[in-house]
């Protein structure tokens, strides 16, 4: 089992951010966490990575039961994370190669000399992800898509059991977005691939390699289940409080409004 949350709630600064979350992810499942801005997605990710602890309820992630075992770095080394928050913490003068290498130590920057095996692994990942050509370039000079590939290589360095991709294609143009989504499909289809949790508020990013979706709305689970059972006209119209029509193309969902927007 990858994770299990039973009746989990989170209170921060006197406000309930998450309420009564029930969620179970089995090994080899790939999930989408889908919700609008402010739905509580970031807070939920912070709990999964043990930066926050639940106010109430029971929670297990990768065999670690919150409140009963020591977490922190021990858990986070099993999780590969790609997020905008992480990107802002990295040293801009580091090369893409150094960024990837740092994933072996779950560190920001390098503070020890990597072994030959570690260096070869980083090179192999950068090659596999189509990023080797800019391995020696400073991180700050890379395009957003190139930065994301370096971050994904970093996330995979420690052979994580869970790979969390938090809105990884934000800021990319159409071509760069589709190329990175192709890379994510490639990763998901590899032998011994980690379970993937893909976080987004754009339905068109949801790929056929994802099995299930958790719909989060105002800190609560709106729905959870198979992708095509969750992303229906009826469910999404209720989720968005507006009529929605779902178009499927090559097993990917695209949303349109079922009625035109009118002025109030």
Curated annotation (Swiss-Prot):
GO terms for molecular function: ATP binding; ATP hydrolysis activity; ATPase-coupled transmembrane transporter activity. ATP binds at residues 35-42. Pfam families: ABC_tran. Signal peptide: none annotated. Gene3D superfamilies: P-loop containing nucleotide triphosphate hydrolases. It comes from the Bacteria. Residues 3-243 form the ABC transporter domain. Its EC number is 7.-.-.-. Keywords: ATP-binding, Nucleotide-binding, Translocase, Transport. Induction: Highly repressed by CodY. Disulfide bonds: none annotated. GO terms for cellular component: ATP-binding cassette (ABC) transporter complex. Belongs to the ABC transporter superfamily. This is Uncharacterized ABC transporter ATP-binding protein YlmA.
């Amino acid at each position: 089992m990858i994770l299990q949350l039973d009746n989990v709630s989170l209170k921060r600064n006197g406000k309930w951010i998450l309420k009564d979350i029930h969620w179970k992810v089995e090994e080899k499942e790939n999930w989408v966490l889908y919700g609008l801005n402010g739905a509580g997605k970031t807070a939920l990710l912070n709990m999964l990575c043990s930066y926050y602890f639940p106010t109430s309820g029971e929670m297990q992630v990768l065999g670690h039961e919150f409140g009963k075992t020591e977490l922190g770095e021990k858990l986070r080394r099993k999780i590969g994370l790609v997020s905008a928050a992480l990107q802002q913490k990295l040293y801009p003068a580091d090369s893409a190669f150094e960024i990837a290498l740092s994933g072996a130590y779950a560190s920001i920057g390098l503070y020890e000399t990597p072994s030959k095996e570690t260096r070869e692994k980083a090179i192999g990942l950068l090659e596999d992800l189509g990023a080797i050509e800019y391995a020696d370039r400073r991180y700050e000079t890379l395009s957003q898509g190139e930065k994301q590939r370096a971050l994904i290589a970093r996330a995979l360095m420690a052979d994580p059991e869970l790979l969390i991709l938090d809105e990884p294609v934000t800021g990319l143009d159409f071509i760069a977005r589709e190329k990175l989504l192709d890379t994510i499909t490639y990763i998901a289809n590899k032998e011994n691939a980690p379970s993937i949790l893909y976080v987004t508020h754009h339905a068109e990013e949801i790929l056929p390699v994802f099995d299930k979706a958790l719909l989060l709305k105002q800190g609560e689970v709106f729905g959870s289940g198979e992708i095509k059972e969750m992303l229906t006209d009826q469910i999404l119209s209720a989720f968005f409080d507006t009529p929605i029509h779902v178009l499927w193309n090559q097993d990917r969902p695209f949303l349109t409004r079922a009625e035109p927007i009118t002025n109030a």
